Amino acid sequence: RQFDADRAALLTALPAGGVVGVLECATHSGDAVRVLELAHSAPYFHAAIGIHPESLIEEDAATVAVYHGDWRAELAAMRPLFADKAVAAVGEIGLDHHWPVPRQEQYDLFEAQLQLAKELDLPVSVHDREAHAEMYELLRKYKPRGALHCYSGSADDAAWLVEQGMYLGFGGAVTYKGAKRAAKVLAAIPHERALLET
């Protein structure tokens, strides 16, 4: 709501500023309708529909508030949304070991969504926080195409991910003086595989 006053003007101005596309990600079924509405508002907006691992414990997320933690039922209910032509990806999905989200539950959820992306031939928008080993295990198994946002892994892992066809997203923190690891990663991958994130 804090952006409501000038949102329309800002969104309309994006192409003039050189923006060629925007991918808005849902984090649970409760976000999906809003994300689809935005995706239908202009040809350069696209939707990603998925269940974020943190939605497994967020009380206001539909995963908890509506489905009482039954992500399988929620994912089944979301399935018809993927027929919408504005849906360009499955996301935001992934693993997050920073928060107290049951690890096996989020692993199973992520794997189910990777299977869905493969079945629908859609790319993925992936979240990976402090879960690199398990993340790479599933990426090796399913070999999705898409983007790993807010990349924080090593240069070697980045090279492997790019070889698999993934894009790597980097936020403003890469400009910090102490961001030496990010600088090494950016030097190790083709620039066209790096995405800037807000």
State the predicted function of each range.
Residues 1-198:
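Mid-domain alpha/beta scaffold segments of enzyme catalytic cores
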